[in-house]
């Protein structure tokens, strides 16, 4: 279980195009207080990215609190399994459990924008091996196309506020 958690901790930053699929996902992550911006884990600790709600064996599970409702649940599940598998396969030991609030903790390994997340996603050999390079390139191409379309739109806020500053 602990190697699985460490796999989540290590590989989540590389899987952000799955966990945070669009510009609003990144807004939610970095603009709200209730979303973990870290790769910490804790028992019953909602401020951690990876929460173990109960340590009773029959109820034990790990919640990944980074993905939102705008994700593809099948891809998120596959990404979680892949991360955990790599943690077990590589026998990676997890960090210590976080018992205090981690809401203020921002992990520097978490990409801050779509471009950074796509670069990390495309360049991790282990992730490419598990998900297949063609799949990785396809996801990255779609995310880039969506982001470019977003950047080409002038918002009503820009028209209303910035036009007055000219």
Show where each model-derived region lies.
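Acidic, glycine-enriched catalytic cores built around paired aspartates
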Residues: 102-166
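Active-site capping/gating regions of soluble enzymes
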Residues: 1-98, 102-107
